[in-house]
Curated annotation (Swiss-Prot):
Domain of life: Bacteria
UniProt source species: Clostridium perfringens (strain ATCC 13124 / DSM 756 / JCM 1290 / NCIMB 6125 / NCTC 8237 / Type A)
Upper lineage: Bacteria, Bacillati, Bacillota, Clostridia, Eubacteriales
Site (Important for substrate specificity): R11, T71, Q155
One GO BP: nucleotide metabolic process
Name of the protein in its database record: dTTP/UTP pyrophosphatase
Length: 192
């Protein structure tokens, strides 16, 4: 059975390559702005990932396992997604500075052969160092934070700001590897 990653994220591709030998990338065209956060962060990221997977699965013509994910940073009851602009990135990074936040990723697997849907969620706590405005501006000027939830990438320059994590490192990158591995074990595909 074919494996399809419903994401254009190079980080998700890199993570999936660790456990699945062959897969295709098909970007989801689902509009994330059609789902509003209503207080339940786990439901929110699972709903987003499920809708991404559904959109891709409807375009496929052969039996496949479609994998989709959505990752957000959550702090003080607020969802921090990708920054809209540099000012938004500055605001996000300033709020993360010296504090602990949580990163939630929802994953969804759809088996298009029998239309079974599996969703799950992972959470990782991340502790940030205290950052001054110059450090934040320099990081924003690198361009790295602009396409990442919470305006930082733990696997890149943003990793220098992380004092520690509790939970899955790959979840912070955008795809909870252990949860995904366990979910994929239920399918007849080659993993590892």
């Amino acid at each position: 059975m074919k494996v399809i990653l419903a994401s254009k994220s190079p980080r998700r591709v890199e993570i999936l390559e660790k456990i699945v030998k062959e897969f295709e990338v098909v970007q989801s065209n689902f509009d994330e702005n059609t789902i509003d956060f209503k207080g339940d962060i786990e439901k929110y990221v699972k709903d987003l990932s499920r809708n991404k997977a559904i959109e891709v699965s409807k375009r496929l013509n052969e039996p496949s396992i479609v994998i989709a994910a959505d990752t957000v940073v959550f702090q003080n009851g607020k969802v921090l997604e990708k920054p809209k602009n540099e000012e938004d990135a500055f605001s996000m990074l300033s709020s993360l500075s010296g504090n602990t936040h949580k990163v939630y990723s929802g994953i969804c697997l759809i088996n298009t052969y029998d239309d079974t849907v599996v969703t799950d969620c992972d959470c990782t706590e991340v502790r940030f160092s205290e950052l001054n405005p110059r450090q934040i501006r320099n990081y924003i000027n690198s361009g790295e934070p602009m396409d990442k939830a919470g305006a930082y990438g733990i696997q890149g320059l943003g990793g220098a700001f992380v004092e520690g994590i509790k939970g899955c490192y790959y979840n912070v990158m955008g795809l909870p590897l252990n949860k995904l591995y366990k979910a994929l074990e239920n399918y007849d595909i080659t993993i590892l």
